[in-house]
Amino acid sequence: MRLVFAGTPEFARIALDALLAAGHDVPLVLTQPDRPAGRGLKLTPSPVKQAALAAGIEVAQPRSLRLDGRYPDEAAAARAQLERVAPDVMVVAAYGLILPQWTLDLPRLGCLNIHASLLPRWRGAAPIQRAIEAGDAETGVTIMQMDAGLDTGDMLLERAVPIGAQQTAAQLHDELARVGGQAIVDALAALAQGGLAPRRQPDAGVTYAAKLYKAEAALDCSLPAAVLARRVRAFNPVPGATIRLPGLDDPVKVWRAQALEQAAGGTSGAVLRADAQGIDIATGQGVLRLLELQKAGGKRQPVDVFVRGWQP
């Protein structure tokens, strides 16, 4: 099948690789413009762009696809490229730009999105992190026929994935990326044979996965320890959960923690114990044990190493 691929981060790169491995003709890739990255803030191409160039695929990087927006010339150029390649379908995965109606209408079979949740739960920007934060037992991938709404299109295929008790957002991301890559390959194969029936999303069970903000990273110790432990996992690696510890001017990043079902016995945020087993923090309900930390400007350390250079 002849398709255009639109995506930007590693999640999308894995899907592109799966499509190419399945033998699909991908003459054009859309991805976000190069961004400054690293300590030197060097302009760096997205993972999708790197994969596309390595495969000899033409790449377009418009800042917008809106013909009436801030960059109409770039949008018009992208439209001309899409019309020239005349795709059967556009596959979209974490692209990062809004697709205007002309884009949705241009491919013969429309635009298919790889969404990292079981819709209609967790529509929006951060479905992986919000599923972990909420304590969901499972999530998954939905292949969706895109429409003008926010992840509201008809569902074509779903694949469920259990969420491990200690699984981080980074680990779940990698698993869902793999599942998503196979799911879109399977969906396109079924679509080509007319064996994929769109299903309207149910009205019940709609939730929204709001974008992650850096301000969320600071752990509020008045909350239950179980909630805080989930946030540590959900915000690993970005934005990274942080906590303030006595004797340190800057917040400390928390990479691993666990909730202990025991009475806190102290004011929320107080350090109850600090040794090689963990740093125990009183919370609104239970105790949060910190297991892996990172000082500002330092390296990640297991707690037994961390406590050697710090005492409350």
UniProtKB/Swiss-Prot annotation:
InterPro entries: Fmt, Formyl_trans_C, Formyl_trans_C_sf, Formyl_transf_N, Formyl_transf_N_sf, Formyl_transferase-like_C_sf, GART_AS, Met-tRNA-FMT_C
Keywords: Protein biosynthesis, Transferase
UniProt enzyme class: transferase
Entry's Gene Ontology cellular component terms: cytosol
Gene: fmt
Binding site for (6S)-5,6,7,8-tetrahydrofolate: S117, L118, L119, P120
Taxon lineage: Bacteria, Pseudomonadati, Pseudomonadota, Betaproteobacteria, Burkholderiales
PANTHER family attached to this UniProt entry: METHIONYL-TRNA FORMYLTRANSFERASE, METHIONYL-TRNA FORMYLTRANSFERASE, MITOCHONDRIAL
Gene Ontology MF term list: methionyl-tRNA formyltransferase activity
EC number: 2.1.2.9
CDD domains, A to Z: FMT_core_Met-tRNA-FMT_N, Met_tRNA_FMT_C
The name this protein goes by in its record: Methionyl-tRNA formyltransferase
Reactions the enzyme catalyzes: L-methionyl-tRNA(fMet) + (6R)-10-formyltetrahydrofolate = N-formyl-L-methionyl-tRNA(fMet) + (6S)-5,6,7,8-tetrahydrofolate + H(+)
Protein family according to the UniProt entry: Belongs to the Fmt family.
Annotated function: Attaches a formyl group to the free amino group of methionyl-tRNA(fMet). The formyl group appears to play a dual role in the initiator identity of N-formylmethionyl-tRNA by promoting its recognition by IF2 and preventing the misappropriation of this tRNA by the elongation apparatus.
